[in-house]
């Protein structure tokens, strides 16, 4: 993760012309880091003795990053970044813990992974598997900044770090 962010800084903040970084293999690298980070965070949330406190710290840390980027780099704001997501996911998980605990672990793993894959491209307007659209979602869902946090960004929405509840919450659980 540190190496990835070092290269991100060099490419996007320092203007290093490195075409590979915007290619397929860099995307795979980035996604493997994201998925691992979110899976581990979800696991730690389940084991935490203070998930509300940790969720609030993550959420407000993400809010501070969003505010800072809006002020310092308004052309590259971070809206609904990974810290905001992790905090929100932890806070949503707390009241759902009793329900989630009733699901057998193997079934929970299969359901969560399947729902993650199904909702993977919800921010592009559909449910499907591996870039194969199965269900086009209503355009009305993609209307404003609040819906972007859920996973339905409006066409003009922009964020340099975007982790909406859908699909990532399924990976967190």
Label for each model-derived stretch:
Residues 1-173:
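Alpha-helical transmembrane segments and their immediate juxtamembrane cytosolic regions
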């Amino acid at each position: 993760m540190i190496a990835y962010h070092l290269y991100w800084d060099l490419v996007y903040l320092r203007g290093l012309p490195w075409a590979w970084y915007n290619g397929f293999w860099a995307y795979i690298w980035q996604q493997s880091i994201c998925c691992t980070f979110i899976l581990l965070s979800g696991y730690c949330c389940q084991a935490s003795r203070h998930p509300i406190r940790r969720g609030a710290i993550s959420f407000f840390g993400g809010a501070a990053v969003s505010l800072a980027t809006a002020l310092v780099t308004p052309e590259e704001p971070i809206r609904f970044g990974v810290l905001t997501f992790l905090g929100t996911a932890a806070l949503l998980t707390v009241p759902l813990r009793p329900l989630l605990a009733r699901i057998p672990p193997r079934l929970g793993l299969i359901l969560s992974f399947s729902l993650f894959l199904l909702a993977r491209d919800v921010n592009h307007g559909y449910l499907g598997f591996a870039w194969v659209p199965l269900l086009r979602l209503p355009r009305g869902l993609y209307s404003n900044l609040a819906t972007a946090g859920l996973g339905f960004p409006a066409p003009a929405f922009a964020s340099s770090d975007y982790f909406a509840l859908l699909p990532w919450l399924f990976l967190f659980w």
